[in-house]
UniProtKB/Swiss-Prot annotation:
Residues 90-128 are annotated as: Disordered. Residues 90-119 have a biased composition (Basic and acidic residues). This is Homeobox protein Nkx-2.5. It comes from Xenopus laevis (African clawed frog). Residues 124-183 bind DNA. Keywords: Developmental protein, DNA-binding, Homeobox, Nucleus. Gene3D superfamilies: Homeodomain-like. It is found in: Nucleus. The homeobox domain binds to double-stranded DNA. Transcription factor required for the development of the heart and the spleen. Implicated in commitment to and/or differentiation of the myocardial lineage. May regulate the expression of genes involved in cardiogenesis and play a role in the formation of gut and the pharyngeal region. Binds to the core DNA motif of promoter. Heart and gut tissue. Homodimer (via the homeobox); binds DNA as homodimer. InterPro entries: HD, HD_metazoa, Homeobox_CS, Homeobox_NK-like, Homeodomain-like_sf.
Length: 299
C-alpha cells in the first residue's frame, strides 16, 4: 500500500513549532523592514532627556563595542539607533503645526475666563459715507424726476457721480422714507386735532388728611341749600278768639246748645254745625276764599 500524503493542520503542535522555527530563520533584512514599518507610530513621540541618563551617542558606542566583542551579528548597529535618530531629527516647528484647532479655542476661552473685566473689542463699523454738495444736488434732482431707479439707471448714475451702486440705492431708500414721513406730518397738521381737554380734579386728601371738611376754594355749581319747609306762610287758626274755634273737636246739632271752650290753647277744636255762619264771618274779614282752602288743608 502507498503511504498517504501528510496533511498539515494549522493547529497541531508540529505546525506551531515549525512556525517558531520559521520566524527564527528569517533574514535580518526582513525583520528590519517590518520594524521600520512599525516605527512610524513611535516616531510621533519625542524622546525627552532626563538628568543622570546617558546620552544617545554613549548608548550607540556601548552597543557597537558589544557587537565587536561578541563577534559579527546578524543585525547592524545602525539598526538600533535609526529610530532614535529619526525621532530626534523631527523639527519642533512641524510639531507645533499639528496642534488641534480645538486646543486653540480652549486657550482663547481660558484667557477670557481669566480676564472677565477686560472689555471685548467691538467690531469697527464702516465709516459713514459723506456726499458732496454736487452729489446731493444731482441725487435730489434725479429723485424729483424719478423716485424709483432700475438697476441700469442706478449703475449709470453711480458712474456719473463716482459712487457705488449700493450707495445710490441706499440713498434713494432713505429719501423715500423721509418723503413718506413728511406726508404723514402734513396730514396730521391738516386734520387739526383739538388739544386734549383739561379737567379740574378736586383734591380729596392732602398731606394724609382729608380735605372734605375744609372750605373748598371753588364754588360748586351744585351747591343747593335745602331748608326745612316752613308753615308760616299761612295764618294759624289757633289764634282766633271765637268760641267756635277752640281746641277740642265736638260735633253738635243746632238744637243743642254749643259747649263753651275749655281753654284757648288746646290742640283740639270745638266745631258746631249751627255756628258755621259765625266761623265764616272772621274768615271773610281776614282774607279771601283761597286763604280758607289753604287753612282747611293745613288743618
Amino acid at each position: 500500500m502507498f503511504a498517504s500524503p501528510v496533511t498539515s493542520t494549522p493547529f497541531s503542535v508540529k505546525d506551531i513549532l515549525n512556525l517558531e522555527q520559521h520566524q527564527s530563520g528569517l533574514s535580518p533584512m526582513d525583520i528590519t523592514s517590518r520594524l521600520e514599518n512599525s516605527s512610524c507610530m513611535l516616531s510621533t513621540f519625542k524622546q525627552e532627556s532626563y538628568p543622570g541618563t546617558p546620552c544617545l551617542s554613549e548608548l550607540t558606542e556601548e552597543m557597537s563595542q558589544r557587537d565587536t566583542a561578541k563577534g559579527p551579528s546578524s543585525f547592524p548597529g545602525s539598526f538600533f539607533v535609526k529610530n532614535y535618530l529619526e525621532m530626534d531629527s523631527k523639527d519642533p516647528k512641524d510639531h507645533k503645526k499639528d496642534i488641534c484647532p480645538l486646543q486653540k479655542t480652549l486657550e482663547h476661552d481660558k484667557r477670557e475666563a481669566e480676564d472677565p473685566e477686560r472689555p471685548r473689542q467691538r467690531k469697527r463699523r464702516k465709516p459713514r459715507v459723506l456726499f458732496s454738495q454736487a452729489q446731493v444736488y444731482e441725487l435730489e434732482r434725479r429723485f424729483k424726476q424719478q423716485k424709483y431707479l432700475s438697476a441700469p439707471e442706478r449703475d449709470h448714475l453711480a458712474n456719473v457721480l463716482k459712487l457705488t451702486s449700493t450707495q445710490v440705492k441706499i440713498w434713494f431708500q432713505n429719501r423715500r422714507y423721509k418723503c413718506k414721513r413728511q406726508r404723514q406730518d402734513q396730514t396730521l397738521e391738516m386734520v387739526g386735532l383739538p388739544p386734549p381737554r383739561r379737567i379740574a380734579v378736586p383734591v380729596l386728601v392732602r398731606d394724609g388728611k382729608p380735605c372734605l371738611g375744609e372750605s373748598s376754594p371753588y364754588n360748586s355749581p351744585y351747591n343747593v341749600s335745602i331748608n326745612p319747609y316752613s308753615y308760616n306762610t299761612y295764618p294759624a287758626y289757633s289764634n282766633y278768639s271765637n268760641p267756635a274755634c277752640s281746641g277740642s273737636y265736638n260735633c253738635s246739632y243746632s238744637s243743642m246748645p254749643s259747649m263753651q271752650p275749655t281753654s284757648a290753647g288746646n290742640n283740639f277744636m270745638n266745631f258746631s254745625v249751627g255756628d258755621l255762619n259765625t266761623v265764616q264771618t272772621p274768615i271773610q274779614q281776614a282774607s279771601s276764599v283761597s286763604a280758607l282752602h289753604h287753612g282747611i288743608r293745613a288743618w
